[in-house]
Amino acid sequence: MKTQRQVPATITRKTFLVGTGSLVAGPLLASRALAATEAQAGDRHREGPPVSAYPIITGGTWVRGANLKDAQGRFQARQEHAAVVLNGFVYLIGGFVPIQPPPQPTENNPEPFAFEGTGEVLVYTPQGHPALPPAVPGQWVSLPPRSWFPLPHMHHIVAVSHRGRIWAFGGHAGPFARTDGVFVFTPERAGSPVGTWSPVRVTDGGPCRPGEQCLTLPTPRAAGAAVSFGSRIYLMGGVVPHENSPDPVNQSIRTTDSVIYLDTTVFPLRWRRAPSLHASREHFNAVVRRGRIWVFQGRNEVSTHLRGVESMRPDRGGWRKEQDAPVGASANILAAVGRRVYSFGGEFIASNITGTLQASQVFDVSTRSWSRLATTVTTAPLDATGADAKHGTYGVTIVEDGVRKIMAPGGAATAWFDPMSKVHIFLPPGG
């Protein structure tokens, strides 16, 4: 096995200069304009310690997994999807994928947009996990159309595994149309990844039929995070409708600090408010550890690469600020194994410069402290280079042949739209 050592939490970036069509790779020190943007981005985080103040620990290895493939067996590049583990299977829901067949250029539109949202659901079955067809251990398969998400062309969905089902909230339809739907995926039988989606009836939580009151979000929301906590689902942050917003990406939306929860055992179903986050954020992730909900990084109108972390013990007060991450990031790979929460890569936008961060960092929930992480990357039989420098995919923790791993399926190597079908898998230190 060929390997190479990765430098922890460096800020080498692949950067697209908006409006110029040029690509810059490497440290952004070559021009005054880029250096000025670096200074502006750094000014926003002076309240936190410098990167060099964080200790470095060594451990963990990146490898490549099976590539994503669509229903026709083609490699399927995908980003901005939801990734959820249910009954040991990994589900990819929504996201941007290449239009098939590719759109042809015209005089009016010589460079047509090549991507669209999708309702196709892909499933990965870990090695050593007993499963019924169509599951194939160690491979991705496209589920039968009856198991696809009920709305086509979806992306930035918020989804969570909760009490034996997948709950999916909001998201964007088409280019960036707002949605407030709530859909639940129920497996058909034990050991099978196949199932059906349905809206949720308010009165008893069953499948909602035409003419019945179906559960929706209080307001459309996308790109937030959700966790399962006991009988509740907590939905946090994200973007909500707002005209003439200062958002640097989309002036029809703004980030929110809103936190709401749903107790799926209390009927009629009803969304309730929880304490708001200290900082609004979207394109972030969250985990549950030691009886607390932890939210990490993300972006908002102040910064597109937040360092901030917050945690809350439900029904025991509000959010507690935690130590800032060494490097701010949004849309980064994030997942927990044991007491450690790992964060890799991410996206940033500063002035007219966008890019991805090459960063490996780890948070210990027992000590409430961050470290930089020096990892190893295998280059054979498949090259795992770039695992710690992508965005648009949120890590999930899987168990394969009895070993806990972090999977990062798809995503993008550069900012905005640059999806890949590569799947990267991180083997944490200590197995």
Sequence positions of predicted segments:
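Kelch-like beta-propeller repeat domains
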Residues: 37-431
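Cleavable N-terminal signal peptides
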Residues: 22, 33-34, 39
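N-terminal secretory signal peptides
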Residues: 1-11, 22-27
